[in-house]
Each structure stands twice: as structure tokens, then as C-alpha cells.
């Protein structure tokens, strides 16, 4: 009986030893990780205000995951068709609040760098001056305005307002066009919340000194989903017309007017990525 008891103890000891060794052999998680993202560069000549053609490039950024900080940034930008300039900044000062890391830096021809990284969404954006000559705002192709104040006017003259609607624009710098998605919009006339309204063709994009104006003179067909009896339903009854959306990257402002089916929509908010 005693031999059996000690045999059982030996088995438990062996299991404990193996488990302990497994814990000791675990490689520690790296404190930093470097990521890359494709960016659209909005470029303006500082002195004259001349708007230059958009360019695309990658940004590299290093994150200290333990302290939730951006510690290094490598910028790339091509000015008006010239060769791409690469600048690495290591003297970065950053702080994080509510999942958003804001960071600043300068050096190697870059002045007044201000950026933000969203730990939840994985989005990054930077504004900076280059060589004292150019103002550059680099964003990812998808530009968001979340929790936007939205007013709707219906055909019978009634109105509704909401603060939780989100607008997304996907900018194509080559064709200067953009798709649009509207999310969480209340249609009070039909007592339904539109989960998403996605345009099926692109609107035109004009590049301004501050950012972009997205507009369309023609009606854009959409695919719209909404919940009905607990299930998602799809409809085409919310085409977009009379669209004019102003995206002010310099001041982080968003304004838009459009006709969404029979609903006249006005939106005001912030650029949030």
C-alpha cells in the first residue's frame, strides 16, 4: 500500500517538474514590435498653399507594448513625383489615454510631427512639416468620422437627430474617387436603424488645402442592411444623391450633406483616425 502511495506521489512530482520546466522555457514576449501601414500623403507647399498630387507610401512605427507608447517612426514621402524621401525619428515623446496614443517628434528635416495611434483599431496618422517647405498629412486610405451628429429630415417634414452615426470614406489617390459607408443611421420614418449603407460606385474626390471634398452630382446606388425581427435584411432603397462631404484633415472636422433615399441628411463631426 505504501509503495503504491509513493508511486502516486512520484507521478505527481514528475508532472509538476515537467510543468515547471515548460513555464521556464516560455520565451518572454517582446517589449516592442514594429509595424508598417500604407498611407496616403496629402501635401501642400507651405509658402504658397499650392496643393500637390497625392502620393502613397509606407510608414514604419515601433510600439512599446508594455508601456503602450510609440517609440520610433520611419516616414516616407515622394514630393510631386520626385524620388521618395525616408526619415527615421527615434526621439519620440508619446502618451496614451483611452486606447489612443498621441506622439510628437522632430529631426532630420522633419518639424512639428504630431501623430496618433489607436490601439483598438490599429490605425495611425501623422502630420508634419518637411524641410520647412511642405506640409504633409499622412492618413490610411480609410478615413472615419465616428459618433457624428446627424440630422434627418423626412418627406412629411418630421425630423430626427442622433449622435452615434459613423461615416467612412475609402480614398483612391490614383483615380481621385472614394467609396462611402454610413453606419448606425436611424430612419425614424420606418422605425429602423440602418446598420450600414455602402455605395456601389465611387464619388469624385477634390483635394483641397485642408483635406478633401467628396461629392457626386449623380445618384449612387447602395446596398443597405438593417435589422428586422432580429434578422439582417438587405435593401437598395437608400441610394445616395446630392452628396457633398468635406473632410478637413488639418482641423479634424467633418461635414456632409446628402440625400439618402427620401431622407435629407446633414452630418457634423470630427475626423477620428
Where do the protein language model's features map onto the residues?
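Bacterial Sec-dependent N-terminal signal peptides
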Residues: 2-10, 14-40, 129-148, 258-273
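Short, hydrophobic/aromatic-rich segments at coil-to-beta transitions
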Residues: 30-38, 68-73, 95-104, 142-149, ...
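Flexible, membrane-facing loop/turn or short amphipathic-helix motifs
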Residues: 41-52, 82, 132, 137-141, ...
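Polar/charged low-complexity regions in secreted precursors and cytosolic/nuclear IDRs
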Residues: 48-49, 56, 64, 80, ...
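N-terminal glycine/threonine-rich, aromatic-flanked beta-hairpin/loop signature
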Residues: 54-88, 160-198
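Extended lipid/amphipathic-ligand handling interfaces
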Residues: 58-65, 88-94, 114-119, 166-172, ...
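Contiguous, well-ordered beta-strand patches that form the walls/edges
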Residues: 76-114, 188-241
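Repeat-associated, polar segments at repeat-unit boundaries in modular proteins
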Residues: 90-94, 114-142, 201-203, 210-212, ...
Amino acid at each position: 500500500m505504501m509503495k503504491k502511495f509513493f508511486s502516486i506521489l512520484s507521478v505527481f512530482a514528475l508532472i509538476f517538474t515537467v510543468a515547471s520546466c515548460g513555464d521556464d522555457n516560455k520565451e518572454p514576449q517582446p517589449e516592442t514590435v514594429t509595424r508598417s501601414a500604407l498611407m496616403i500623403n496629402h501635401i501642400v507647399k507651405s509658402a504658397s498653399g499650392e496643393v500637390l498630387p497625392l502620393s502613397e507610401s509606407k510608414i514604419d512605427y515601433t510600439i512599446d507594448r508594455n508601456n503602450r507608447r510609440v517609440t520610433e517612426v520611419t516616414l516616407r514621402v515622394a514630393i510631386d513625383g520626385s524620388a521618395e524621401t525616408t526619415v527615421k525619428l527615434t526621439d519620440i515623446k508619446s502618451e496614451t489615454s483611452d486606447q489612443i496614443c498621441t506622439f510628437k517628434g522632430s529631426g532630420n528635416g522633419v518639424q512639428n510631427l504630431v501623430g496618433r495611434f489607436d490601439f483598438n483599431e490599429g490605425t495611425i496618422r501623422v502630420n508634419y512639416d518637411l524641410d520647412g517647405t511642405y506640409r504633409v498629412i499622412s492618413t490610411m486610405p480609410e478615413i472615419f468620422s465616428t459618433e457624428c451628429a446627424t440630422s434627418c429630415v423626412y418627406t412629411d417634414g418630421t425630423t430626427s437627430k442622433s449622435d452615434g452615426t459613423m461615416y467612412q470614406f475609402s480614398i483612391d489617390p490614383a483615380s481621385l474617387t472614394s467609396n462611402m459607408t454610413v453606419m448606425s443611421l436611424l430612419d425614424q420614418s420606418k422605425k429602423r436603424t440602418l446598420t450600414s449603407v455602402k455605395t456601389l460606385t465611387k464619388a469624385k474626390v477634390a483635394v483641397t488645402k485642408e483635406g478633401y471634398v467628396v461629392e457626386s452630382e449623380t445618384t449612387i446606388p447602395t446596398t443597405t442592411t438593417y435589422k428586422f425581427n432580429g434578422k439582417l435584411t438587405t435593401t437598395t432603397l437608400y441610394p445616395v444623391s446630392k452628396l457633398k462631404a468635406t473632410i478637413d484633415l488639418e482641423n479634424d472636422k467633418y461635414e456632409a450633406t446628402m440625400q439618402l433615399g427620401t431622407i435629407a441628411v446633414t452630418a457634423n463631426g470630427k475626423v477620428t483616425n
